[in-house]
A protein has these predicted regions:
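Sec-dependent N-terminal signal peptides
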Residues: 6-8
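Conserved small/polar residues in nucleotide/adenosyl-binding loops
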Residues: 146-148
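Acidic, glycine-rich flexible loop segments
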Residues: 84, 90-138
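Extracellular or lumenal secretory-pathway regions
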Residues: 17-90, 141
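Positively charged n-region of N-terminal signal peptides that target proteins for export
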Residues: 1-4
Length: 148
């Protein structure tokens, strides 16, 4: 397995329903272990498993949370439209929130997509919502360092 470090600029905007409804806008950075099968000419299959720390406005359920995501995508001529995955958000109050996501983008540049909040634990057991996420790739100083 090839290990690559990712820095994630992750923006999430979502409406979620609890006793109330609202929006959140979180950002963060993290690192991912990546498996890559390179077919040449911008054709690759990629799977990843990683963690990130997030921040949001003070008092938001996602402020000072961490997330663990597992997903994958297939690049064809340097572009992808099939990214899928799932994330667990570990909240400061000890609870968890789960999302599924789909995305598209360009290898080495970034991507965006939609996500669905599929549930949580404890007081967030019935949480639901949808939203949009995006990431921007940054250039690393070495070939083994990739930033997204």
């Amino acid at each position: 397995m090839k290990k690559i470090i990712f820095v994630l600029i992750f923006a999430l905007v979502s409406a979620h329903s609890l006793a109330d409804s609202g929006k959140f806008n979180a950002s963060g950075a993290g690192s991912w272990a990546v498996n890559v099968m390179d077919g040449g000419n911008g054709n690759m299959s990629i799977t990843y498993d990683g963690n990130a720390g997030l921040s949001d406005k003070e008092g938001s359920i996602f402020d000072k949370s961490t997330m663990h995501c597992i997903g994958g995508l297939t690049l064809v001529a340097g572009k992808f439209d099939d990214e899928t995955g799932m994330c667990t958000f570990y909240l400061m109050d000890g609870e968890k929130v789960f999302i599924n996501y789909k995305g598209k983008g360009t290898g080495g540049q970034g991507g965006s997509g939609d996500f669905v909040i599929v549930g949580g634990t404890g007081k967030y057991e019935k949480i639901s919502g949808t939203g949009f996420s995006s990431r921007q790739n940054l250039k690393g100083k070495s070939l083994s360092l990739i930033h997204i």
